[in-house]
């Protein structure tokens, strides 16, 4: 990795193994999670702690666990759970959504193509998209490969079980396989 920014992001956000200040409390609060879900919770905690976003859009969550980790990592974040086709009307602060930093979590299930397309067309360039299940099957893998090449996408990180997409297109387009 030649980019200092990408190196720091991989080292201190994606692969950080040092226990964060809230991990122990969160493990007691949110118990009974399988290993992969706990790993994702911690990743979302670190990502939100790093970005300090104004909004976190949680599309079709399989569990409420992400909410606890996200809100513990950033006190100012406005968490929104979306269980149906997304519309800006679902968010009280919709006028800020297109101009503020936002993290959108979308599992590649249900009608994910429309949700991803909507997010890419409407969120600010400071936003980040996290897609779960990018290597789940042939279709999701193909979708991920197309997304990497999409003109609305900047730097991407392939973590195998999920993909992190930065919408800042003024950065040199690069896909890091971590």
Where would I find each of the regions flagged by the language model?
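A short alpha-helical cap/connector motif
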Residues: 1-125, 135-178
